[in-house]
Amino acid sequence: MQWAVGRRWAWAALLLAVAAVLTQVVWLWLGTQSFVFQREEIAQLARQYAGLDHELAFSRLIVELRRLHPGHVLPDEELQWVFVNAGGWMGAMCLLHASLSEYVLLFGTALGSRGHSGRYWAEISDTIISGTFHQWREGTTKSEVFYPGETVVHGPGEATAVEWGPNTWMVEYGRGVIPSTLAFALADTVFSTQDFLTLFYTLRSYARGLRLELTTYLFGQDP
C-alpha cells in the first residue's frame, strides 16, 4: 500500500515537473516571436469606431487593418461569421487574422449571453464597439461593467465570469499559444451542441489564417 501511494506521488511530482518545464519552454518561445499587431494598436483603432453601428464600424476597421498590415488580414471572400459555443455562453466571431501566436477577430452577440471565460495560455483583450460587457473576476465579490470605447484585458491563466448584453459587439486581439485556446472554444461544440458544421467552419477559418501567414512569409506581401 505504501509503495502504491509513493508511486502515485512520484507520478504527480513528475507531471508537475513536466508542466513547469513545458510552461517555461512556451514562454521562452513566445519571447522569440515577432508579432504583427500590438494590443494598444488594435484597441486604439477600435475606439475610433466605438458607438457607430457595429457593421459600419467593422467594415471601416477591416479596411484600416488591411492598409496598415497588408498580407495579414483575410480577404473578404474568406471572412465568415461563425457561431461560438464555449463556457456556457453563445456568440459569433469573424476571424480576420490568425497565426500560432496571435489573432484578431470580431466578436459579439445579438441576443446577450453569459458564462465562463475560460483559462488560456494567452492574453486576450476586447475593445467594445457597442453594448455592454460585464466581468466578474475570480477571487472578487463584485463585477465590473465596460462600455463602448473601453478595453477589457484577460491575462494568461486568469478566469472570470462574463456577460454580454444584447447587441454587444467588440474587436478582440489575442497573443500567446493560440492553438491552446481552441480546446475551450470548441469543447461545447463537440460535447454539447454537436454542431459539427460549426466545428468545420471554425477550423477552416483558422486554417485560412495560417495559410495566409505562411504565404505572406514565403512570398511577401501583395503590392
From Swiss-Prot:
Main location per the UniProt record: nucleus
Site label Important for ligand binding, positions: D126, E172
Keywords: Amyotrophic lateral sclerosis, Cell junction, Cell membrane, Cell projection, Cytoplasmic vesicle, Disease variant, Endoplasmic reticulum, Lipid droplet, Lipid transport, Membrane, Neurodegeneration, Neuropathy, Nucleus, Postsynaptic cell membrane, Receptor, Synapse, Transmembrane, Transmembrane helix, Transport
Compartments, record wording: Nucleus inner membrane; Nucleus outer membrane; Nucleus envelope; Cytoplasmic vesicle
Consequence when changing E158G: No effect on ligand-binding
Pfam families, alphabetized: ERG2_Sigma1R (PF04622)
Cytoplasmic topological domain: 31-223
Residue segments, region Targeting to endoplasmic reticulum-associated lipid droplets: 2-8
Regions crossing the membrane: 10-30
GO cellular component: anchoring junction; cytoplasmic vesicle; cytosol; endoplasmic reticulum; endoplasmic reticulum membrane; glutamatergic synapse; growth cone; lipid droplet
Region Important for ligand-binding, residue ranges: 99-106
Keyword Nucleus part of the UniProt annotation: yes
Membrane topology classification: Single-pass membrane protein
Tissue-level expression: Widely expressed with higher expression in liver, colon, prostate, placenta, small intestine, heart and pancreas. Expressed in the retina by retinal pigment epithelial cells. Expressed in alpha-motor neurons.
InterPro entries cross-referenced by the UniProt entry: ERG2_sigma1_rcpt-like
Side of membrane Lumenal, spans: 1-9
Disease: Amyotrophic lateral sclerosis 16, juvenile: A neurodegenerative disorder affecting upper motor neurons in the brain and lower motor neurons in the brain stem and spinal cord, resulting in fatal paralysis. Sensory abnormalities are absent. The pathologic hallmarks of the disease include pallor of the corticospinal tract due to loss of motor neurons, presence of ubiquitin-positive inclusions within surviving motor neurons, and deposition of pathologic aggregates. The etiology of amyotrophic lateral sclerosis is likely to be multifactorial, involving both genetic and environmental factors.
Domain comment (free text): The C-terminal helices form a flat, hydrophobic surface that is probably tightly associated with the cytosolic surface of the endoplasmic reticulum membrane.
Description of how the protein assembles with itself and partners: Homotrimer. Forms a ternary complex with ANK2 and ITPR3. The complex is disrupted by agonists. Interacts with KCNA4. Interacts with KCNA2; cocaine consumption leads to increased interaction. Interacts with RNF112 in an oxidative stress-regulated manner.
Additional remark text: Depletion by RNAi inhibits growth and survival signaling cascades and induces cell death. The antagonist rimcazole produces the same effect.
Record function comment: Functions in lipid transport from the endoplasmic reticulum and is involved in a wide array of cellular functions probably through regulation of the biogenesis of lipid microdomains at the plasma membrane. Involved in the regulation of different receptors it plays a role in BDNF signaling and EGF signaling. Also regulates ion channels like the potassium channel and could modulate neurotransmitter release. Plays a role in calcium signaling through modulation together with ANK2 of the ITP3R-dependent calcium efflux at the endoplasmic reticulum.
Family the UniProt entry places it in: Belongs to the ERG2 family.
Protein name: Sigma non-opioid intracellular receptor 1
Gene source species: Homo sapiens (Human)
